[in-house]
A protein has these predicted regions:
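Active-site and adjacent substrate-binding regions of carbohydrate-active enzymes
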Residues: 1-437
Length: 437
């Protein structure tokens, strides 16, 4: 599930600005509701995975409020500076996450008369893990949620949690120490709980977050690289990058388990392996620009309908937004009432899901993909959501379309039956973890 802990309203980055790590947001229910949900899911053989935001709190979290009030204990929970001397030094080496909508990495707090490190949005204050109290309190919250029945934690923005001057503040060695410490605590207290790392970084950085067989860190990671290469291969009709990436994946040790997916709540960041691209005589920048324009629908012959996210004209960088169905061409084909185009779009959709389903690891189906849910362009009419194009693929689930999944001949039925066939094939013993191939 997406973040459901107490958050400020309306500005909460989709729940990734947390006011209270121990309490379900009142708009969604209570802690008792969460406990009842995990119990019912477990009866059905389902483990609940919950987002846990490690890097920051909301600026309205009680720790932040105490810091604003001048409490030195809680001011030490954050990175605070009286003037721009150190922040300016950080800015020389630390990239910006949202250069257009939230430029810079620091925010001025008038109540404290201090600068606050805010990697993401100005209302998300980065925690200071150099303070042991931060690790202790965050670990307590994870254990509290585990006691409510959460069995898998998707630890968010892990590569960012350690800050050091003169670096990019990404993927630093101390990050791995902290994740290792968290894994050790969980193995002692609740050994069945799983850590799933959200590491949206260059391919060369990914494997380190598994740790080693002797010193494990995350149990699983999102397979960002394969996801990006699948979309890249579909648009370019060139599988060389995908093959190179899969070859590298299969060479990883046995302790490396990935969650394979096509779409999620986030954008598609075109983090392809530039060294491999150059070896294949592919211009990395031009290739990236081609891909994000293609999936924007802004390239001759493109079947996709999507939007750019976080476009930076200075670097030419951008990411892509849209649902699987819309990016595969289903939305455009329906608009044009083109049956041939629709048939091809459905085949693209099922092709990607087939590739994803039979990779080593755990296939993850994004909610709505099973009924070909389209982009939700109505977000542009919501003043609280219009600034973030990721809301294009964050629509409410379309229950009316879901009813069509059992009606033979409907678009929804085509996708539903295709997914069911993949599920049955994946359940075959030949795909068991201990199967010999």
């Amino acid at each position: 599930l997406m973040p459901l802990l107490q958050m400020p309203h309306p500005h909460n980055d989709g729940g990734y600005a947390v006011e209270d790590f121990d309490t379900v947001d009142p708009a969604l229910g209570t802690n008792k509701d969460l406990e009842n949900l995990t119990r019912e899911l477990r009866k059905a053989g389902i483990s609940l995975c919950l987002d846990f935001v490690m890097n920051h709190t909301a600026s309205t979290h009680r720790w932040a409020m105490a810091a604003k009030a001048g409490d030195p204990w809680f001011q030490a929970y954050y990175h605070l500076y009286d003037d721009r001397t150190i922040p300016d030094q950080y800015e020389q080496t630390v990239p910006q996450v949202f250069p257009n909508t939230a430029p810079g990495n620091f925010t001025w707090c008038e109540e404290m008369h201090k600068w606050v490190l805010t990697t993401f949005h100005d209302y998300q204050w980065d925690l200071n893990y150099a303070n042991p109290a931060v690790f202790v309190d965050m670990t307590k919250s994870i254990l509290h949620l585990a006691n409510l029945g959460v069995e898998v934690f998707r630890i968010d923005a892990v590569p960012y949690i350690w800050k050091q001057l003169g670096t990019t503040c990404r993927n630093l060695p101390q990050v791995h120490t902290i994740v290792r410490m968290l894994r050790m605590v969980l193995e002692c207290v609740c050994p069945a709980v799983i850590l799933k790392g959200e590491v949206v970084m260059a391919p060369k950085e990914l494997a380190a977050y598994f740790g080693t067989p002797e010193k494990p860190e995350c149990h699983m990671l999102y397979n960002v690289s394969t996801m990006v290469n699948l979309w890249g291969a579909l648009a370019s009709r060139d599988t060389r990058l995908l093959k190179a990436q899969l070859d590298a994946l299969h060479a990883l040790p046995d302790n490396c388990w990935f969650v394979n997916y096509l779409r999620c709540h986030d954008d598609i960041g075109w983090g392809l392996d530039e060294a491999v691209e150059k070896r294949l005589s592919i211009d990395p920048q031009k290739h990236k620009e081609y891909l994000y324009h293609f999936y924007e629908g802004n390239f001759p012959g493109s079947w996709a309908k999507g939007e750019l996210y976080n476009y930076d004209p200075a670097t030419g960088d951008a990411r892509s937004c849209g649902t699987t169905a819309s990016l595969c061409g289903i939305e455009q084909a329906l608009e044009k009432d083109d049956k041939t185009a629709l048939d091809y779009a459905v085949k693209r959709d099922l092709l990607l899901h087939t590739a994803m389903a039979f990779l080593q690891g755990f296939p993850m189906l994004n909610c709505g993909d099973e009924i070909a849910q389209l982009n939700g362009w109505d977000y542009k009419n919501d003043p609280d959501r219009v600034e973030d194009s990721r809301n294009l693929h964050r629509s409410k689930f379309n229950w009316e379309d879901a009813k069509q999944r059992t009606r033979k001949g409907t678009l929804q039925n085509q996708l539903w039956q295709g997914m069911e066939q993949l599920r049955q094939m994946r359940a075959d013993p030949c795909f068991a973890p201990d199967a010999w191939v």
